[in-house]
Amino acid sequence: VKILCQEQGCTFIASRENRGYNAGNNIGLRYAAEKGYEYAFVTNPDMEFPQTDYMAKLIGTMEKDPDIVVIGSDIVTPEGRHQNPLDFLSFWSEFLWPIDLLRCKLTKKTTSSSLDPTISRYCPMLSGCCIGLRIDFLKRLGFFDENVFLYCEEPILAHQVKKAGKKLYYLADTQALHRHIKSTKGNPYKRMSLLCDSRNYKNKYHSDYNAFEQSLLTASHKLRKWIMEILAKQSQKSNKRSKK
């Protein structure tokens, strides 16, 4: 990667450790802030941008409206699924997670609800795989919250924007392609535990839930982790038997 960046005239900043998506992005965002940039774009490495005026349109929209501090485009998968704009996961969907998981499997949708991608508008939340950000807003925040590792970055940022009285904006006439890279996801129990811990943190520090609602969600996530732990142990036993 370092050699490729040198060939393409890009700045490569190595991280000494993997502290998660937000912490990694903050390295680049702080660098951009130090260099005096007004805007920054955070994208996954599996994004493609066939639209030549993509950046110009997004930045132009932010220039016209100073209340917009986060902006996103239409994001489409090779299968034609739209990943923007997004709505928050509701309290009941998070609390009654078995029902929500079943709904997602049947509809093949994510737990965050996708809204109509044909209309440009202010929106509750945007996918973190490709977003434009106003640097001065990030500086006031102290940059991205680094207390989560892999999950809940989008709802945390969306709540911070809402709390600051600013806006997220979805621009429908710009489009990027997300060729999602399928990778080995590792231990499912550890991933579920990480998701539950991230949601508990998000609900405590970056939500409008009261103490009672937070306690209900914490109990629900505790049950979810316990069930996943049992399933993981059963899977390990089954794998050991099959190897004999």
Predicted regions and their residues:
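Non-catalytic, C-terminal membrane-associated alpha-helical segments of glycosyltransferases
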Residues: 187-244
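Acidic donor-binding segment of Leloir-type glycosyltransferases
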Residues: 1-17, 27
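Conserved donor NDP-sugar-binding/catalytic core segment of glycosyltransferases
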Residues: 48-85
